[in-house]
Amino acid sequence: MSLRILLVGNGGREHALAWKLAQSPLVERIFVAPGNGGTDNPQGKIENIAIGSSQKDFAKLVEFAQSKDVGLVIPGPEQPLVEGIETHFRKVGIPVFGPSEKAAVMEGSKTFSKDFMKKHNIPTAAFENFTDYNKAVDYVKKVGHRVVIKASGLAAGKGVLIPTSTEEAIAAVKEVMQDKAFGEAGDEVVIEEFLEGDELSILAFSDGYTVVDMPPAQDHKRIGDGDQGLNTGGMGAYCPAPIGTPALLQEIKESILQPTIDGMRRDGIPFVGMLFTGIMLTPDGKPKVLEYNVRFGDPETQTILPLLSDDTDLAEVMLACVERRLDAVTLRVKPDAHAVTVVMSAGGYPESYKKGDAITVGGLPEQTYIFHAGTASENGQVITAGGRVIASTAVAPTLKDAVAQAYKGADAVEFNGKYNRKDIAYKAFRDAEKTSGGITYAQAGVSIDNGNKLVQQIKEKVKSTARPGTDSVIGGFGGLFDLKAAGFRDPLLVGATDGVGTKLKIAQSIDKHDTVGIDLVAMNVNDLVVQGAEPLVFLDYYATGKLDVNAAAAFVGGVADGCIQAGCALIGGETAEMPGIYYGNDYDANGTSIGAVERDAVLPRMDEIAKGDAILGLASSGVHSNGFSLVRKIIEHAGLTYTDACPWDQSKSLGEALLTPTRIYVKQLLPVINAKLTSALAHITGGGLVENIPRILPENYSAKIDVSTWPLPPVFQWLGKAGNVPKEDISKTLNMGIGMILVVKQEKVAEVTQLLEKVGEKVYQIGEIVPDNDVDEKTVLINTENWY
């Protein structure tokens, strides 16, 4: 394959891209428009062309690309992408590594991107968007925290103001919205919470489905050492940043990068190209999005590309992205390697500066590279032509060595008025000094203090579950139960253990955790009651990568609510913080319930079940806690998010509707059980009616169920239609509106129905017991054709 590439732009980023792409055996020629003094090398693979990168140049660029049989276009800067360069080339059949105009709005409009993050529950600073100056000022006056003022549109990286007081914030709003310091970019502003912490730059390739992130980098925006002085386009960077631990990067990928790519696709603006996300790592260790960029960062690109492994072909990776097959190519970085970039600027930058000074470059250390930015070639001499002129990047086995090498490279560059910072990567060494005294348990990712806070928050709630036989005091090593005090004569103990499953993913996505606590109890106690047992005690296990005290407290509060509904005591549990096993705030939960049943009351009594016995059904509250892998797949297929309005209940979000907790059937069934009015009960969980009813049937008998005897809840109608799920399949996965069934003698149906209706149950007579030889399956469903 002989690939010709058109690379649009003229900065250090574009030189680094051209340098790396030229190493690919796939690449025959790289045309850089307009390029700089470093990309002007017609004797090699790289050649400048005298066409600009602004919107008025798009037609010329397309014409040139067609004339040269270009097979891939790579826009470097954000402006052409925001202005729709991808559309111009797509119309003539030339693929572009970069997002469409609609997708590029993620960088082109900060208000759009903030609203997107809010919609898709992507962690970011609290914010409000404004087009009205007076309303913006009123908000600044009333808000109770320090703020950042951002011009919504593109402002060449300068449209962010960080005031230190309310007065300064009001002045900043005026500067942006009324004085038009950033032109039309300031017609709309984002006023957001000021976040403190360390920043990370995460560059990630995406084909619209898969996302592959590069090692985390940190850049240096301020002109002066110690991050003092005016903002710049970036005075240096280093990679990988030590604070970007594997656990943190996994959390960023799962809570930010993948949800961003998935959300854009579902919103009809799939993202193809390089997603560059600015992350703030707050003091509590949580990553939050500062901003999205839809292209390679500068100077991060100059720092990261030299770290790609020798078997990683950048051209092949980019082609894989545009061909939607990123998961099929190799993308690796060199092991045990560090890179540092030192940017050299013209004297006076970022304010007024001189151009036209001659540049010379002497001998460089091994694995040290020079990338041109604001340079031009004039009569064979490279001269200064911009504010950030040139950069030295070095790769070495240690960060310390990479810093030393990069500065040696910078020393080899000479031009009049040259300036560079002397402290690139200082944050990495500062962080190392902080931990030199030894590693604490908290630094390993486990907070004893947070665990203690959780216990204090849930103590009273747990205490409210006390019942005869126990005291429900937490904080010890377990719990005791006095069967005699609970009134049992000759009991058998019955145990059940279960979890909530992938329903937890929905709870985590919309930050609502109380109802899944009820689910956990329900899944266990319903399995006890079908054995005739009264639930007595409950214990929960909650495991997470990083303990969010409020989320865990809400979850345990839900567990306590479920215990109260079931009449059992929450006597203990375990909260495990396990970074590396779980990532970020993701969690899993399991519960165990112990109950008791008198020896002569154990269910099912299969010897009593006979032909003609009635099967009664009690309604479910919805999907309950099984089948959510199918449910989530249907939601994805439908292109919905959990914050969208629920299709079958517009008063709720989709996530809220799906989190309706599993019904607990204990208190309404115990009187029926104690009166020996039922011979068997079945909890309809995973496997649906088809798989669960056979558990209670004796040999030679089957169940015949008429699904027209109860109304199919709207949630199941919608899921079936939206996923086009075969009825045979959905009936083996979801409960379809019946959460519990009872086998009852025909002569007892009226009495059982009356008992259950007294406590508010709606009872449906849904089928009967039939001999095996009358049907083909152990559970036969009829009239399913009318479901949806």
Swiss-Prot record:
GO BP annotations listed: 'de novo' IMP biosynthetic process; adenine biosynthetic process; purine nucleotide biosynthetic process
Annotated pathway: Purine metabolism; IMP biosynthesis via de novo pathway; 5-amino-1-(5-phospho-D-ribosyl)imidazole from N(2)-formyl-N(1)-(5-phospho-D-ribosyl)glycinamide: step 2/2; Purine metabolism; IMP biosynthesis via de novo pathway; N(1)-(5-phospho-D-ribosyl)glycinamide from 5-phospho-alpha-D-ribose 1-diphosphate: step 2/2
EC number from the UniProt entry: 6.3.4.13, 6.3.3.1
Co-factor note (free text): Binds two magnesium or manganese ions per subunit.
Residues reported to bind Mg(2+): E291, N293
A molecular function (GO) term: phosphoribosylamine-glycine ligase activity
Reaction(s) catalysed by this chain's protein: 5-phospho-beta-D-ribosylamine + glycine + ATP = N(1)-(5-phospho-beta-D-ribosyl)glycinamide + ADP + phosphate + H(+); 2-formamido-N(1)-(5-O-phospho-beta-D-ribosyl)acetamidine + ATP = 5-amino-1-(5-phospho-beta-D-ribosyl)imidazole + ADP + phosphate + H(+)
Pfam families: AIRS (PF00586), AIRS_C (PF02769), GARS_A (PF01071), GARS_C (PF02843), GARS_N (PF02844)
Entry-linked CDD domains: PurM
Subcellular location: Cytoplasm, Cytosol
Region (AIRS): 439-752
Region of interest called GARS, as start-end residue ranges on this chain: 1-429
Binding sites annotated in the UniProt record for ATP: 140-201
Domain ATP-grasp residue range list: 114-323
Gene3D superfamilies, sorted: 3.40.50.20, ATP-grasp fold, A domain, ATP-grasp fold, B domain, Phosphoribosylglycinamide synthetase, C-terminal domain, PurM-like C-terminal domain, PurM-like, N-terminal domain
Function: Catalyzes the second and fifth step in the 'de novo' purine biosynthesis pathway; contains phosphoribosylamine--glycine ligase (GARS) and phosphoribosylformylglycinamidine cyclo-ligase (AIRS) activities.
Protein name: Bifunctional purine biosynthetic protein ADE1
Organism of this sequence: Yarrowia lipolytica (strain CLIB 122 / E 150)
